[in-house]
């Protein structure tokens, strides 16, 4: 009932020619602006109150992803202030009856609803708000082309195309490149989403494809190659080959090191064996040099004594069939100094016979002993 009363009251005032309240006018409710450029949002007002000292102008911004409007500009009594992210970017009009603002350097995130609100106390009736929808136009960014599925013959695949930026939303078109010709692809294609369904890939469908994203500001394109295997296969093959090469290198290094260690071990063993073989020979030589003279050599030495000894003492040497005549100790026991060197070790006759003698000393024993005794017998038996 009350609402009907107010409606009737406003109608009567209009018919009477009496206009009370603030009237806000928005000439353009939809505004498009290119990214990076400036835009002027026009908002005018009319009031029945002559005094403008308490007049206030407020602009708010409502983004499609926000939950409530945000104040970006406020002016009262001729004092204006820009607020939030629009600070230093908004300039308001100083003309009476004009509440317009100019925003510089518009960005894609500035797209949304702008609300102009004018209030003048005591003038409470009328339309004091107006709205403007602003769209910041952006050329489509370079789209991203991709393959869904395995790009091999007989496998179902689809091609996708998407531009991250673009206002208004771009429309997508697919083309197949055949040499210098560009052939539009129309079947199984959605221009709004940019998805091209190919199905089971055949040799006829292999080739180069191009996707173009278009809006009122321009277009951008991307290309995709269906003539080579899917990149994932190449990555797997590359990883396998790299791993195989790494294993071969490791095996080669281990084999080389083991071979080198083995060679050093053989050389060390060979040197040790040579040293071991030389030690007994050295001991034998030292022992041979330090041994006493054999009995045969002593007999030969007696046989080669000077003749004066035989003449003066004929009984000193006897034949093999006679008893030996004792000789004076000074004449029969010449002192022979042992050679300087290691201590002589006496050895039994059996040990002397078993040890090998040098080649020059191997003479027949009868010849060395009998010949001198035969000659003595001739001398002794006249």
UniProtKB/Swiss-Prot annotation:
Specify the superkingdom: Eukaryota
Which Pfam family is an annotated match for this chain, by its short name? Answer: Ig_3
Instruction: Tell me where the transmembrane regions lie.
Output: 235-255
Stated membrane topology is: Single-pass type I membrane protein
* Entry's localization field: Membrane
Q: Which residues lie on this side of the membrane: Extracellular?
A: 22-234
Q: Where is this region: Disordered?
A: 266-382
Positions of disulphide bridges: 43-116, 161-211
PANTHER family cross-referenced by the UniProt entry = V-SET AND IMMUNOGLOBULIN DOMAIN-CONTAINING PROTEIN 1
| Name the record gives this protein | V-set and immunoglobulin domain-containing protein 1
- Source organism per entry reads Bos taurus
Q: Gene encoding it? A: VSIG1
């Amino acid at each position: 009932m009350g609402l009907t009363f107010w409606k009737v009251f406003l109608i009567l005032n209009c018919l009477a020619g009496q206009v009370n309240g603030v009237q806000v006018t928005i000439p353009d409710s939809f505004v498009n602006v290119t990214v990076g450029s400036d835009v002027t949002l026009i908002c005018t007002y009319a009031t029945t109150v002559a005094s403008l000292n308490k007049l206030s102008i407020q602009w708010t911004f409502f983004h499609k992803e926000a939950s409530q409007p945000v104040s970006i500009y406020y002016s009262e009594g001729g004092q204006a202030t820009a607020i939030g992210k629009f600070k230093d970017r908004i300039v308001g009009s100083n003309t009476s009856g004009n509440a317009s603002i100019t925003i510089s350097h518009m960005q894609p995130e500035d797209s949304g609803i702008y609300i102009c609100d004018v209030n003048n106390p005591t003038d409470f009736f009328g339309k004091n708000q107006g709205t403007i929808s602003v769209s910041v136009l952006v050329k489509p960014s370079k789209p991203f082309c991709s393959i869904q599925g395995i790009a091999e013959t007989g496998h179902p695949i689809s091609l996708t195309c998407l531009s991250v930026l673009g206002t208004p939303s771009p429309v997508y078109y697919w083309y197949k490149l055949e040499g210098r010709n560009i052939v539009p692809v129309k079947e199984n294609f959605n221009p709004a989403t940019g998805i091209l369904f190919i199905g089971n890939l055949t040799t006829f469908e292999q080739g180069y494809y191009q996707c173009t994203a278009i809006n009122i500001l321009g277009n951008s394109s991307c290309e995709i190659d269906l003539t080579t295997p899917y990149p994932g296969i190449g990555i797997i093959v590359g990883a396998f080959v790299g791993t195989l090469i790494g294993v071969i290198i490791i095996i080669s290094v281990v084999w080389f090191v083991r071979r080198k260690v083995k060679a050093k071990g053989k050389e060390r063993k060979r040197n040790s064996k040579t040293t071991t073989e030389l030690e007994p020979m050295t001991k034998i030589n030292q022992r041979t040099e330090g041994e006493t003279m054999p009995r045969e050599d002593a007999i030969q030495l007696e046989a080669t004594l000077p003749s004066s000894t035989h003449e003066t003492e004929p009984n000193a040497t006897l034949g093999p069939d006679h008893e030996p005549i004792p000789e004076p100790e000074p004449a029969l026991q010449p002192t022979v100094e042992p050679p300087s060197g290691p201590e002589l070790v006496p050895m039994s006759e059996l040990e002397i016979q078993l040890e090998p003698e040098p080649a020059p000393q191997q003479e027949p024993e009868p010849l060395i002993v009998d010949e001198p005794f035969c000659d003595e017998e001739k001398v002794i038996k006249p």
